[in-house]
Design a protein with these regions (language model features):
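Pre-active-site segment of Zn-dependent metallo-hydrolases
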Residues: 46-51, 55-118, 122-129, 133-164, ...
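Cap/insert and terminal regions of metallo-dependent hydrolase folds
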Residues: 198, 202, 211, 221-253
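Short, well-ordered alpha-helix to beta-strand connector turns
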Residues: 89, 163-166, 234, 241
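Core dinuclear metal-dependent hydrolase active-site scaffold
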Residues: 4, 12, 16-87, 168-227
């Protein structure tokens, strides 16, 4: 994602978030309201490849869109979860299974940031691939922690527990009639094929008469994947820009 990590979006208007991460996630500090049904806070993935994670606040709920890691040469970079209250995240939406979009899921479980009944919502292929990739990531993490003489950031139990939250859907399962409900708020959501990986999807969220679309990672032009499905119109679009500075690119995977 090619956006400024010190800014976020409130229905298309850029807002300064330099101090946002220092604000505890209490009800008194919630920014979303009648005039701004969505507030989006980048927790990772801005001006970098990896650790994609967006914190979406609505009037009654808090959600994460993706929850990945960035694998460096000497260390793993996790999203910045500072200011998120324990058990305050009501659901996590995954655009696809690559570890830069899913690898920090055991961290939010370990830090007890997910509400008791919070689901992890994904397409069926993404759910299946995430089971494989997160267990593989755990083994790598255990080996690296042992080699460096450090404590583990998460455990096998965390992987097991967060995967136990997985709720998988077909691409069109989030159309009108299916929605995530938190308290008195109906958050409608829809997945559409993003053509990047088996099960990859863009995500549309809708509440309060407004809609925001997250592209996830797009494309690959693979003969083994269907074409990208056009998303609905949106008030705000969060768009991948990994190769946005190149006039041509033959493949994106």
């Amino acid at each position: 994602m090619g956006s400024d990590p010190s800014s976020g979006t409130v229905l298309g208007e850029q807002v300064d978030l330099d101090e946002k991460f220092d604000i505890p996630g209490t009800e008194e500090n919630r920014v979303a309201g009648p005039e701004t049904p969505f507030v989006v806070i980048p927790r990772g993935g801005c001006r970098q490849v990896g650790r994609s994670c967006y914190h979406v606040q609505t009037r009654e709920g808090d959600y994460l869109v993706d929850c990945g890691i960035a694998q460096g040469q000497s260390a793993v970079d996790y999203p910045d979860f500072q200011g998120i209250d324990e058990r305050s995240i009501d659901a996590v939406f995954l655009t696809h299974a690559h570890i830069d979009h899913t690898g920090a899921l055991p961290i939010v479980e370990h830090q007890d940031l997910l509400a008791e009944a919070a689901p992890v919502i994904a397409t069926r292929p993404t759910g299946a691939l995430a089971h494989v990739l997160l267990h593989d990531s755990l083994k790598i993490h255990q080996d690296e922690a042992c080699e460096m003489g450090q404590d583990q950031e998460f455990t096998r139990d965390d992987v097991h527990d967060v995967l136990g939250r997985m709720e998988t859907l077909q691409y069109a399962a989030g159309e009108v009639g299916d929605f995530v409900s938190v308290d008195d708020e109906a958050l409608r959501f829809k997945f559409g094929n993003a053509g990047h990986l088996l099960g990859s999807a863009w995500l549309a969220l809708e509440t309060g008469g407004r809609r925001i679309v997250f592209s996830g990672d797009l494309g690959g032009r693979s003969a083994h994947l269907p074409d990208i499905e056009g998303p609905p119109s949106a008030d705000t679009l969060v768009l991948e820009s990994t190769y946005g500075d190149r006039p041509q690119h033959t493949g994106f995977n």
